[in-house]
């Protein structure tokens, strides 16, 4: 594929809901935020300093500017003499696009807690005063009155500050500015050859024709009442398996979700839209101390829509831990294995027909050379080829057999009903018996007349669903919030949250890579997964390589440095050191506004495992011939392989196996180890959430019993990753599905034991 290749189809637009009428920032606060963002990603010019407004552009000496142009041309492989695109690229600032203000407004107004929003606005206001600026920058001039170069030096100074507040502030603001610029820049994609979508010859399939219950308009204040046997809250990986099994067993099932269904022609969804339509909280939830960024699916189909296709079953040592340490012997049994095998069979999980891209090949080949354990990762792609590096924003081809392609259609065909746009506010209980659930109550919001969610002509109704049984499948972040808002008091609700924290490594190669092409995660190095002998360590894997998701996680070292680093992405591969975290955190509703709040900081124990994984990844990249190696650890420069010939192609030889005992490289790894993972400005990332309503043997140590029944209640169940007793150590999707199937089997067994049950004794679920 040439650098000018683009997707041969149009992705259907998915407009966002309107912003609040009131601007979340005042004029002074906007001026300061723009001044900071422009210092992070500055307009760079080649001009006489006397002719440049230094507040609006950062002039570079002619030789520095010309050298930068040459390097960017080489990195982007522009062959012609026309450097207009490079000039435009350098001249762009973070706020050049009119989308900047809209994206910031949406984030501040809709996706920040009141506490975080007030903190940000306070800092921005302080920097707009002489006194505040003097205290925070050392200049007695408001920040927006400083030149771009001076502002850059202020931010770099914050990076090195002894005050954790300033280090954390610098990281957060630099990350935000880079994310928005990478999403909105008109030149980054052209120079990288980044297509924004996979190249397919065929049109997107139509997708399953879901029918959703529509609540009629009414002038009455009384809620709409719907009755069913089972209501399932959440359409993610746990809820959909339960829905299929129960519907096929003959029960009347309704699945509700606060989000909406988007058909394949909307995929891969534009990044600025995907954050709102496919992910929770606008794309990311940040922990209270800012240490970890958590992404979770929030759409019809849940996390299975954005999963990277990796489909791993829980390993033996994890199952033994759950059976022995947590008193749950069924996890070591054949029935649980059958549940795992059945859900994998439905999705066509296998390692057949995988076309490993460069990044995944490097892991397998590097591990082989070093004698480390590694393997291909099974994919839920129906046993077919699935070369899609963008399906973290939805799978256009339906090659990924997620919930909207498999279990939800199966449930529909068995008679299940669906309601989208239904936010459950509380679980309801019988007035005569406060332990007995009677269903759920919440607010339903229709689509607009155009079939989207951006219009203002949307119907809102209160709805009560009366159900004999209620299953909560909102995921580890949202399930405990619903239980707490519904009045449940078990002290374990929301606690023991595990996140599989990761840190990143980037390798730069001499050849063109285009890391967004091909499947995302098809190999794993598991040599270091059991570093403590107790089942805890780090796995080494590839990660999604979309520019705005990957590049901002690395330390910002100045505007020109970042723009040159961005151009290297065309030749990059990216990796994660993923820890099976032994120690957890908690999730709870913000006491001021009820918003989801995550209290989690990676423990020293788990950070040691992450760091070990980072160093081992670097060793593997070196052995495979990477030209440059970067960690997402502040205070550590990248390793650049010395070479007398700048055009040497050290990574092209399949027989190139340089020794990791090279003195320069060894010294660099020692520096990485000595530097450690400093707090609070080392970034961590999580795409797996587990354990916040864990399963156990008693309400003294857990929230649910071995059949998913919530302690102290009747007919209330949880079927999602929140019931994991501890971290799974692998992508939790398959484990979640297997557990949900077992919980559904238990419900069917209970139904069959009751007189006049709708479930016939000889009925067999077809899963």
Which residue stretches match the model-derived regions?
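Extreme N-terminal leader/targeting segments of oxidoreductases
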Residues: 2-31, 35, 39-41, 47-118, ...
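Rossmann-like flavin
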Residues: 135-139, 143-173, 181, 300, ...
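Conserved redox-cofactor binding core of oxidoreductases
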Residues: 172-218, 330-430, 437, 632-668
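N-terminal Rossmann-like FAD-binding beta1-loop-alpha1 element of flavoenzymes
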Residues: 221-255
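N-terminal FAD cofactor-binding segment of flavoenzymes
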Residues: 251, 258-317, 359-368
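FAD cofactor-binding and catalytic pocket of flavoenzymes
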Residues: 490-621, 628, 642, 648-651, ...
């Amino acid at each position: 594929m040439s650098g000018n290749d683009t997707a041969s189809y149009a992705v259907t637009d998915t407009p966002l809901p309107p912003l609040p009428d009131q601007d979340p920032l005042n004029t002074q606060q906007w001026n300061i935020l723009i001044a900071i963002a422009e210092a992070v990603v500055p307009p760079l010019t080649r001009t006489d300093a006397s002719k440049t407004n230094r507040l609006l552009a950062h002039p570079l000496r002619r030789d520095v500017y010309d050298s930068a142009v040459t390097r960017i041309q080489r990195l982007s492989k522009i062959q012609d003499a026309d450097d207009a695109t490079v000039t435009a690229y350098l001249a762009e600032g973070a706020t050049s696009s009119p989308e900047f203000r809209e994206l910031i407004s949406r984030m501040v107004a809709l996706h920040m807690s009141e506490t975080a929003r007030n903190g940000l606005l306070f800092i921005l206001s302080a920097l707009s005063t002489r006194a505040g600026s003097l205290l925070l920058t050392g200049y007695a001039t408001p920040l927006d009155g400083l030149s771009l170069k001076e502002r850059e030096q202020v931010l770099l100074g914050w990076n090195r500050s002894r005050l954790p507040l300033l280090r954390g502030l610098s990281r957060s603001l630099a990350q935000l500015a880079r994310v928005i610029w990478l999403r909105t820049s008109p030149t980054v994609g052209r120079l990288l050859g980044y297509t924004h979508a996979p190249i397919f010859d065929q049109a997107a399939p139509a997708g399953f024709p879901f029918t959703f219950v529509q609540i009629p308009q009414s002038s009455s204040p009384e809620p709409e009442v719907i009755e069913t046997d089972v209501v399932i809250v959440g359409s993610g990986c746990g809820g959909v398996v339960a829905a299929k099994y129960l519907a096929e067993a003959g029960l009347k099932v309704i699945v509700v979700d606060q989000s909406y269904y988007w058909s394949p022609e909307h995929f891969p969804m534009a990044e600025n839209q995907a954050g709102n339509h496919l992910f929770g909280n606008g794309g990311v939830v940040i922990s209270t101390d800012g240490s970890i960024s958590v992404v979770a699916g929030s759409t019809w189909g849940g996390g299975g829509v954005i999963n990277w296709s990796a489909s791993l079953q829980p390993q033996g040592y994890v199952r033994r831990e759950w059976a022995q340490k947590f008193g749950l012997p069924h996890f070591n049994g054949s029935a649980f294995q059958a549940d795992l095998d059945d859900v994998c069979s439905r999705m066509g999980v296998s390692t057949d027909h995988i076309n490993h891209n460069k990044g995944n090949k490097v892991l397998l080949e590097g591990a082989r050379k070093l004698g480390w354990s590694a393997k291909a990762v099974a994919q839920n792609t129906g046993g077919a080829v699935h070369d899609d590096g963008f399906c973290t924003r939805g799978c256009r081809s339906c090659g990924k057999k997620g919930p909207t392609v498999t279990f939800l259609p199966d449930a529909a065909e068995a008679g299940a009903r669906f309601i989208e746009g239904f936010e459950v506010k509380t679980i309801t209980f019988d007035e005569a018996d406060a332990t007995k659930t009677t269903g759920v109550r919440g607010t339903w919001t229709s689509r607009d007349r155009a079939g989207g969610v951006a219009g203002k002509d949307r119907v809102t109704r209160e709805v009560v669903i009366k159900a004999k049984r209620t299953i909560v499948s909102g995921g580890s972040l949202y399930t405990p919030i619903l239980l707490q808002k519904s009045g449940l008091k078990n002290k374990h609700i929301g606690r023991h949250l595990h996140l599989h924290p990761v840190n990143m490594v980037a390798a730069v190669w001499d050849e063109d890579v285009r890391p967004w092409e091909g499947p995302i995660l098809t190999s794993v190095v598991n040599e270091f997964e059991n570093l403590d002998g107790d089942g805890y360590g780090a796995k080494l894997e590839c990660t999604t390589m979309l520019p705005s998701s990957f590049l901002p996680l690395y330390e910002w070292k100045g505007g020109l440095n970042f723009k040159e680093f961005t151009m290297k992405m065309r030749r990059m591969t990216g990796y994660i050191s993923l820890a099976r975290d032994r120690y957890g955190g908690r999730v709870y509703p913000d006491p001021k506004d009820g918003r989801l709040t995550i209290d989690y900081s990676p423990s020293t124990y788990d950070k040691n495992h992450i760091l070990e994984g980072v160093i081992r990844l670097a060793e593997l990249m070196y052995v495979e011939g990477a030209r440059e190696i970067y960690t997402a650890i502040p205070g550590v420069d990248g390793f650049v392989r010395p070479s007398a010939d700048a055009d040497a192609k050290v990574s092209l030889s399949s027989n190139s196996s340089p020794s990791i005992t090279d003195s320069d490289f060894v010294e660099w790894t020692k520096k990485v180890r000595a530097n450690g993972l400093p707090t609070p400005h080392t970034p961590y990332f999580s795409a797996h959430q587990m354990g916040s309503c864990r399963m156990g043997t008693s309400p003294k140590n857990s929230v649910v019993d071995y059949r998913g029944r919530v302690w102290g209640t009747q007919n209330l169940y949880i079927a999602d990753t929140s019931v994991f007793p501890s971290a799974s150590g692998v992508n939790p999707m398959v484990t979640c599905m297997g557990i949900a199937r077992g919980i559904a089997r238990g419900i069917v067994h209970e139904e069959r034991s009751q007189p006049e049950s709708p479930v016939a004794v000889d009925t067999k679920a077809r899963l």
